[in-house]
């Protein structure tokens, strides 16, 4: 039986990973007390015993854990500390045909950011196949449930909801300095050479994410259609069980004309939609920011690293 230690099990992502793994009989979860977590020797000992360690920590704390002396185990880091570090494998199995194998053999895997996952998967095939130039200037808009901000933001929103239900915070843009911490990985793994203009927002609901990427026809290297874009993206992910690429202008996926950012909650699924007409095209990704965008992705990577069925413990 494989032994797994979650370093930072009390946070939003750590709790959900623990919840998923506790239900399995092929994994033993190792634990230490909160007090012992602050004692380097105790933490080193449990890490040394583990077959894999999942870091659910702030960036600096994640770097410190990896740097502990005498640790010869495999790491999955759910923070953004190592996502563009060439010494770490990017934990997005669907990125290309070789990424799963890279994860299987890796000792250091960096779990992708939720926004980056939703952006990279629809955009990378278009750049890889020459439909979009790598120097394209793209814009990205997205909305996520407030759980994406961790325990502090969850508490703020739920307090507001209970104390002032008549004054709900609706969709609220943030990161208006245009320096969101997911941007470096969005650039690196999409194949772009320049940062997209990324404007995320938080919605007044717990979880679920929707990212939209508008594309004008003049951005493309040659004349394209929604059908051609669909074929390009669908061909990339036709064997990926977690990714569904919907046919162009799939109105059956809408709820009375609306796209629901919560439609994939509780799953490890990501849906890609293509809407538009000849001169304007809109790509939309929908995923659970706590599932495929965080805890589900970590479990998927863990399964690959430990030689287990890739989707063990996951709902697709």
How would you describe each model-predicted region?
Residues 26, 89, 137, 195, ...:
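A residue-level signal for beta-strand positions that form part of recognition/binding surfaces
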Residues 7-14, 40, 124, 128-253:
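Active-site-lining helix/loop region of Rossmann-like oxidoreductase modules
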Residues 214-316:
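C-terminal active-site/capping subdomain that shapes the small-molecule cofactor and substrate pocket
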Residues 33, 96, 200-202, 287:
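Short, well-ordered turn and helix-capping elements at secondary-structure junctions
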Residues 1-174, 264, 275-277, 312:
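N-terminal Rossmann-like NAD(P) cofactor-binding subdomain of oxidoreductases
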């Amino acid at each position: 039986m494989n032994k797994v230690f979650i370093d930072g099990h009390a946070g939003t992502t750590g709790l959900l990973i623990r919840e998923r793994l506790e239900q399995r009989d092929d994994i033993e979860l190792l634990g230490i007390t909160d007090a012992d977590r602050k004692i380097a020797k105790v933490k080193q000992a449990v890490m040394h015993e583990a077959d894999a360690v999942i870091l659910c920590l702030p960036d600096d704390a994640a770097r410190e854990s990896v740097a502990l002396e005498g640790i010869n185990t495999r790491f999955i880091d759910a923070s953004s500390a190592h996502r563009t570090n060439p010494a770490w494998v990017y934990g997005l199995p669907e990125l290309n045909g070789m990424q799963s194998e890279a994860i299987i053999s890796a000792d250091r895997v960096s779990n992708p950011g939720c926004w980056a996952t939703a952006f990279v998967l629809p955009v990378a095939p278009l750049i890889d196949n020459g439909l979009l130039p790598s120097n394209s200037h793209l814009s990205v808009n997205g909305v996520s449930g407030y759980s994406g901000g961790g325990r502090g933001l969850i508490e703020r929103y739920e307090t507001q909801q209970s104390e002032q239900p008549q004054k709900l915070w609706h969709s609220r843009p943030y990161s208006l300095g245009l320096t969101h911490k997911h941007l470096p990985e969005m650039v690196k793994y999409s194949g772009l050479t320049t940062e997209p203009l990324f404007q995320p927002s938080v919605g007044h609901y717990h979880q679920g994410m929707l990212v939209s990427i508008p594309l004008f026809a003049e951005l493309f290297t040659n004349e394209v259609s929604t059908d051609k874009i669909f074929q390009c993206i669908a061909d990339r992910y036709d064997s990926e069980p977690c990714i569904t690429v919907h046919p162009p202008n799939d109105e059956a996926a809408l709820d009375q004309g609306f796209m629901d950012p919560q439609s994939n909650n509780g799953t490890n699924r990501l849906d890609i939609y293509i809407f538009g007409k000849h001169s304007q095209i809109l790509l939309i990704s929908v995923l659970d920011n706590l599932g495929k965008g965080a805890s589900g992705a970590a479990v998927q990577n863990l399964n690959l690293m430990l030689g287990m069925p890739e989707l063990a413990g996951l709902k697709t």
